[in-house]
């Protein structure tokens, strides 16, 4: 019996069903860990526990040569790029690593790198889930990274922070671009399957008309691609405007008075910015009410859209410059 390629609705439903079962496993793990270890330990090791259950799910299904529950639900099977035989053991292992382990490692290492850079640049210790600044053990690699970061200049550290932010945003952009391409040609729903060359064949023919379904998904892909390009243009335009605003601000700051009036000295001595640890100049308020220098909080929000003190979400557009603030 000749098997045809799985269509886009089958691939999407299969992935959604797998995510549903994985979410159920994570929920049960949440209850068990909270019952035996407490909420604090669960929050500390939440990502690692979820990774363990995701790996267990795919090792018991894909790695062992069986269908996942989602694949079984829509009657599709994995095949290699030739579409004549099942993927090899190496391909299945690579698929599991790229789909579960690699995103976890990238996210963890990028967060840790940002953590190190912000500590060195601003002197502010950031509390983040899974990262306690005083308790996590440094590996030999991160000791070397820490020494390299400490040897950088302040400008180099700020540039590296922006580079890390751009890389993380680029990964998210790549995922959305890949999803739009999937809607248009329907080959690979996940990036990991594209990298490993794993396709799907359906065991039995679907009842619907594939041509009508494909046309609707192609239209959805075109709309998604247009929206993504529009979003990219807006981001680039916003970045250019921020760069111009920073240049104007630096020029204005050089032209401003170097010494505050006498009646402000006693107050200004107490009003210091917690980012630069200097006298707060051109006070700017976040939506949560904390005050910083305009330049300091603008640079912070351009790399991390949250308040440095209370971690509340805060974009650069929501900052309020306080004129004539005493």
Swiss-Prot record:
EC number(s) on file: 2.3.2.27
Binding-site residues for Zn(2+) 1, renumbered to this chain: 273, 276, 293, 296
Transmembrane regions listed in the UniProt entry: 8-37, 39-60, 90-122, 148-185, 217-236
Cellular compartment(s): Peroxisome membrane
Domain of life: Eukaryota
Pfam families: Pex2_Pex12, zf-RING_2
Catalytic activity: S-ubiquitinyl-[E2 ubiquitin-conjugating enzyme]-L-cysteine + [acceptor protein]-L-lysine = [E2 ubiquitin-conjugating enzyme]-L-cysteine + N(6)-ubiquitinyl-[acceptor protein]-L-lysine
Principal location listed in the UniProt entry: membrane
Zinc fingers (RING-type) by residue: 273-311
Topology in the lipid bilayer: Multi-pass membrane protein
UniProt keyword Cell membrane, yes or no: no
UniProt-annotated binding residues for Zn(2+) 2: 288, 290, 307, 310
Pathway(s) this gene product operates in, as recorded in its UniProt entry: Protein modification; protein ubiquitination
Peroxisomal matrix side: 1-7, 61-89, 186-216
Any one of the GO CC terms: peroxisomal membrane
PROSITE patterns: ZF_RING_1, ZF_RING_2
GO MF annotation list: transferase activity; zinc ion binding
Gene Ontology annotations of biological process type: protein import into peroxisome matrix; protein ubiquitination
Keywords linked to the UniProt accession: Membrane, Metal-binding, Peroxisome, Peroxisome biogenesis, Protein transport, Transferase, Transmembrane, Transmembrane helix, Transport, Ubl conjugation pathway, Zinc, Zinc-finger
Record function comment: E3 ubiquitin-protein ligase component of a retrotranslocation channel required for peroxisome organization by mediating export of the PEX5 receptor from peroxisomes to the cytosol, thereby promoting PEX5 recycling. The retrotranslocation channel is composed of PEX2, PEX10 and PEX12; each subunit contributing transmembrane segments that coassemble into an open channel that specifically allows the passage of PEX5 through the peroxisomal membrane. PEX10 also regulates PEX5 recycling by acting as a E3 ubiquitin-protein ligase.
Domain remark from Swiss-Prot or TrEMBL: The three subunits of the retrotranslocation channel (PEX2, PEX10 and PEX12) coassemble in the membrane into a channel with an open 10 Angstrom pore. The RING-type zinc-fingers that catalyze PEX5 receptor ubiquitination are positioned above the pore on the cytosolic side of the complex.
Assembly with partners or alone: Component of the PEX2-PEX10-PEX12 retrotranslocation channel.
Family, per entry: Belongs to the pex2/pex10/pex12 family.
Record protein name field: Peroxisome assembly protein 10-A
Lineage start: Eukaryota, Metazoa, Chordata, Craniata, Vertebrata
